[in-house]
């Protein structure tokens, strides 16, 4: 929780950035707070729509909250972002997660 507190203080001091929001989202996800993770990860991708790692984690957090349609959208946008940066591994991982979500 110390990392979360430090990151929240940075955010409160006006140091908002995609990396800070991704870091907060990641820490909240690790702490089991998917709802707070989603909040920060959505901010991360708003600040940097090409941030494929944030899209991937956002998709996972949304899926964890059973918000499957939103997770599909996050993975789809994340795949496009990853492919735009030539990040084939991230695109491949998100394609696998998307395929799992689409299973009946």
Predicted feature residues:
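Structural marker of alpha-solenoid helical repeat scaffolds
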Residues: 13, 47, 64, 81-85
């Amino acid at each position: 929780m110390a990392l979360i507190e430090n990151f929240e203080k940075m955010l409160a001091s006006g140091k908002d950035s995609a990396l800070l929001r991704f870091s907060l989202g990641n820490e909240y996800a690790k702490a089991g707070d998917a709802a707070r993770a989603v909040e920060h990860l959505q901010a991360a991708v708003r600040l940097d729509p090409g941030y494929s790692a944030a899209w991937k984690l956002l998709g996972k957090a949304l899926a964890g909250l059973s918000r499957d349609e939103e997770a599909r959208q996050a993975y789809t946008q994340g795949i496009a972002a990853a492919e735009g940066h030539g990040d084939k591994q991230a695109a491949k991982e998100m394609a696998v997660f998307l395929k799992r979500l689409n299973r009946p």
